[in-house]
Amino acid sequence: QAKILVAEAEENNLGEKVINERWARWYACSLCEQRYHGVVGFALGWACWKTHVGRPETDQVRGLAMRLLGSGLSETDHLEDAFSVQEAELSILRRIGASEHHILGVQTNLASTYYKLGHLEKALSMERDVYSGYLKLHGKEHEDSLRAALNYTSSLVALKRFEEARALLRKTIPVARQVLGDNYEDTLKLRWSFAVALYVDPAATLDDLRESVETLAEIEVI
């Protein structure tokens, strides 16, 4: 059904908004609007890719299909395959001169796959580049920049670089609370990451542990 709807929208020049709405049928239920996950998401991603693989590399729909395939592979723990798809997608985007925003999105997915594969240093390096890229593109108050900071600090904590993680989070959390609000999911995740970066540090002081507990208590209330 998604294949037919997208093709119809393109053929009749119904516009980007309509195409995007119909494209969503590939990855989300039209009734409840929840995203497909696991083997269902993977199966639809694979079907989507087979449907659109014959299009030129510069075709937007082909690029979306490739991203959907990579996400499906990653979610079902076919990590090496996901890595190959995402790396190929990034190479294509750079070759065809895609927008910086599009490239940063693919780099975010690739960094996540690096992390899942246990390549933490590579994940950190790419997340640092993504965070820097979003800051230049949108500024520190944009949601993409805040989410990139969250990913970056998660890798810093995983690599036991607690002081660096806390320093970035101390700068980022006030911005997130002001822009997104205290109840927003990304704000809560940033604060949780800060609490973790405090209490898992072997060098944590009593004041650090107290601040961590207080932060977690505040999050729980919210």
Give the predicted meaning of each segment.
Residues 1-222:
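Intrinsic-disorder-linked linear interaction elements in eukaryotic regulatory proteins
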